[in-house]
């Protein structure tokens, strides 16, 4: 029975995916994923990225956010991306493949950033979901904590941070930590985010050293 249920659920997901307006639109516009529209919507509201900025994109693969970021940052900007999964090259994006949870990967990423401060940290990281909330939520919260730690290491004064967070245990405490580090924090649920998803995006501006 469980196998049949999984098969039916998978079929529903596939149908939803291929019928998805944003998936079709992503294909039409040459975006690598529907996630590109999430950062576009956030950018439209919050104007995080401007020409000449340095941006770090965590959880970048397959590259939807990096595509948007590199276009906004322009020729004089810099985009440094990282993901545990491989990502096809994007012109203007310096990509590091590795597990961000590992110290050696963080060190390699910091080396690529160099001495200059970063203007924007983006994180669309998420763990592989098991379907068990008691397992998935702590894993997801650990990743967003690491992303906030990255901000503390590289972000310039008044810098910005946009991070995907799953609502659940630890969310309110995390929100408090972000509010302590930034002047303004807003919660965004982009139209391109599936309604049934628990994901929201915290958009923080005005980093306080």
From Swiss-Prot:
Keyword S-adenosyl-L-methionine: yes
Gene3D superfamilies per UniProt: Vaccinia Virus protein VP39
SUPFAM superfamilies, alphabetized: S-adenosyl-L-methionine-dependent methyltransferases
GO terms of molecular function: rRNA (uridine-2'-O-)-methyltransferase activity
EC number: 2.1.1.166
Keywords noted in UniProt: Cytoplasm, Methyltransferase, rRNA processing, S-adenosyl-L-methionine, Transferase
Protein name according to UniProt: Ribosomal RNA large subunit methyltransferase E
Source organism of the structure: Shewanella woodyi (strain ATCC 51908 / MS32)
Gene from which the chain derives: rlmE
